[in-house]
Amino acid sequence: LTPMKIRILGCGGSFGSPLAWEKNGNIDINNPKNFRTRSSILIKINHQNLLIDTSPDLRIQLYQAKCTKIDAVLFTHQHSDHTAGLPDMRSMSLINKSIIPAYIPKEINESMINNYKFIFQGVKDYDPFMKAHILEDSFKIDDTEIKTFKHNHGSIDVQTYRINNFAYSTDLKNFYKNDIDKLKNLDLWIVGLLRYDPHPSHAGFEQILDYINYLKPKKTLFTHMTALLDYKELLSNCPQNVEPAYDGMEIQI
């Protein structure tokens, strides 16, 4: 299998961590691994940089990653903590003189284009800098094969992405039918864990551990974590080969 490097650009929930006001949940603010920007990852494979989601913190995330080129963006869903950084792709387009492809789930394709017309269609004096592609269950970006399917996130659906033996499932409440079996034989699974207790649109810690016990990936990382989850405490509660991610973490597969 083609080697890849995955960078955790951000692993926080929609508020980020710590919070923007006095109460910081349960985290130790002296531990830098508790400082989490909104969730997004960068995948380096086949000399390409693939981005999953464009968080509101994308500009600083890409700066810290020293990333000056994005070859494609894959979207999981339309919530603003996963899309609001989309305008930051303009600088990438200008630097590389390229139109950046965006792979968007069919049910949100039209609304994404309408919300960001200046990006996908252009406006007076400004050319479009991204091209929308409707997401398919299986597709290729050059030599990289990508598979995707929907999982439940409360009132909406979210895309799980799988590339070789790596998969990314943010904002997960539960899987449909037998779709979980599409995640067997993984070297790495990055999965959302908002908090310990179940949430109306997010699975709780015990349910995620049940999924991990069933799938048995070689390694699991938690993402999309609120300030209710302290890095050190959560790590102490994790079984072997399971741990919280942190911003800037890099994993080679």
What are these regions (language model features)?
Residues 51-55, 71-81, 104-105, 166-172, ...:
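Active-site neighborhood of phospho(di)ester-bond hydrolases with catalytic His/Asp-centered motifs
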Residues 68, 128, 144, 184, ...:
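Structured loop/turn residues at beta-strand edges in well-structured enzyme cores
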Residues 96-100, 108-132:
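Active-site neighborhood of divalent metal-dependent phosphoester bond hydrolases
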Residues 47-104, 186-188:
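Active-site metal-binding motif and surrounding structural segment of the metallo-beta-lactamase
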Residues 176-253:
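Binuclear metal-ion centers of metallo-dependent hydrolases, dominated by the metallo-beta-lactamase
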